[in-house]
């Protein structure tokens, strides 16, 4: 029951973020904060042993995107950074494939825009929140399996 509640909570946050980021090009702190409170409220009492992994995943995902925001200021906003951290809280280690999917999808969309509209498309800004949300959904349903496959194939 708690797993379903956690999945629904994350899916709701990702939907709200996608709609808002596409419409206003901002990821509101209120959505992210509410998502964090709900996520912790579900996980802490039902699966407290997973909290260190989830905290590490949140710090790792948020820190990774923070590097992009700091070194490439126009490319990534702080809302994206905070969303990645929130996804780490919900997904744990499955946030790694979620971010990989998000970056791949965003890159393919950018490439498609450049191929379709030429150099002019390089000056456009495309919100990254919807790509993070898509990656989050993949992470939600297949993230652990993708993580295990990657480790077994390339590391072990």
For each feature predicted by the language model, list its residue ranges.
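Transmembrane helix-loop-helix
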Residues: 1-4
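Transmembrane alpha-helical segments of multi-pass small-molecule transport proteins
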Residues: 6-12
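Functional transmembrane core segments of multi-pass inner-membrane proteins
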Residues: 12-110, 115, 148-156
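Aromatic-anchored segments of alpha-helical transmembrane domains
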Residues: 40-43, 137-141
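Interfacial loop-to-transmembrane junctions
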Residues: 112-138, 150
């Amino acid at each position: 029951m708690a797993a379903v509640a956690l999945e629904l909570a994350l899916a709701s946050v990702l939907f709200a973020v996608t709609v808002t980021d596409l419409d206003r090009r901002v990821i509101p702190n209120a959505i992210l904060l509410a998502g964090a409170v709900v996520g912790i409220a579900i996980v802490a009492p039902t699966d407290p042993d997973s909290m260190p992994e989830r905290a590490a995943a949140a710090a790792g995902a948020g820190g990774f995107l923070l590097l992009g925001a700091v070194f490439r200021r126009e490319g990534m906003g702080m809302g994206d950074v905070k969303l990645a951290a929130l996804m780490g809280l919900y997904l744990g280690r499955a946030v790694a494939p979620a971010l990989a999917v998000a970056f791949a999808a965003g890159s393919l969309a950018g490439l498609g825009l450049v191929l379709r509209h030429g150099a002019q498309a390089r000056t456009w800004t495309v919100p990254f929140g919807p790509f993070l949300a898509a990656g989050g959904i993949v992470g939600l349903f297949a993230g652990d399996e993708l993580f295990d496959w990657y480790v077994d194939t390339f590391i072990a």
